[in-house]
Amino acid sequence: AASPNDPLVLREAGAFHYRKGDMSRADGLLRQAMRIDPRDYMASFFYARMLDETGRQAQASQYYKEVLRYVPEDAEVHEAYARSLGKTGDSAGAYIHMAYSALYSNNKKQAERYFNQAKALSGKANPREFQKLEAAYKERKEIWDKN
């Protein structure tokens, strides 16, 4: 039987309560899972989403960034982070992460659309963030154009 202090058990219980909408239970369980295993990026992802859904986008942003260090090509994480940034009014950042989400989902049409929107707002974005997106987009576009 699994131990109640097993970080996987805590993460899954936290995710269960998050999905049910019981954010206070999810909060405690996910924080406990992250304390025991700080590298459990799935616990951090659910925690970021829980923070985001409870109006704490600034805190959520730190966790989304941490998760992306572990799984930089995860389309779902980029999409969730984009939606969170959109709630704060950071349209440039939101479009950058929506473009990544489309790139990593291999959705050429959406990637082009979001990349162009990010490019139009690039003056308001972190220049390094946009340059990284531009490089990833060009690399993926070359592959798409060959096929």
Label each PLM-derived region with a short phrase.
Residues 9, 43, 77, 94, ...:
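TPR alpha-solenoid repeat register
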Residues 12, 46-47, 80-81, 97, ...:
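Canonical tetratricopeptide repeat
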